[in-house]
């Protein structure tokens, strides 16, 4: 059980859990708009993190970090001047630093007028081979991209059909999708 700590300042909370193989330590990250904390299982203590200068915003996407290549990744949603934008930011567990934004796939929609009027569903997760992001919209187009190691994004799946809104949990063996 983790030692108690106050909820970080700033509303929407994000969190993640992962193994730092360089330091041989399990780490937990908890953050909000203005404060972020890390817990080391090895030391049994929490400490405040620095290094993410601007507030972090989550409007719709789940707040759980996805572990990929030794870093936790989150989808970040921002609202500016009537539109929403989406980016991926990450936290390197070994260096204990927030990283530059990871580019999304070229065809992944990056701005929206409204989550609701655009009929939007997007998310991110990890599979055995890497990170994946998905998108579906009012046209009933559903697309999944995967990223392995340092390479670019590859479109894994693209299909049009009636979707009733769900979050993709993972893949089955052989690349067959399990909604």
Show the residue positions of the predicted features:
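Short, conserved recognition motifs on repeat-domain binding surfaces
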Residues: 1-179
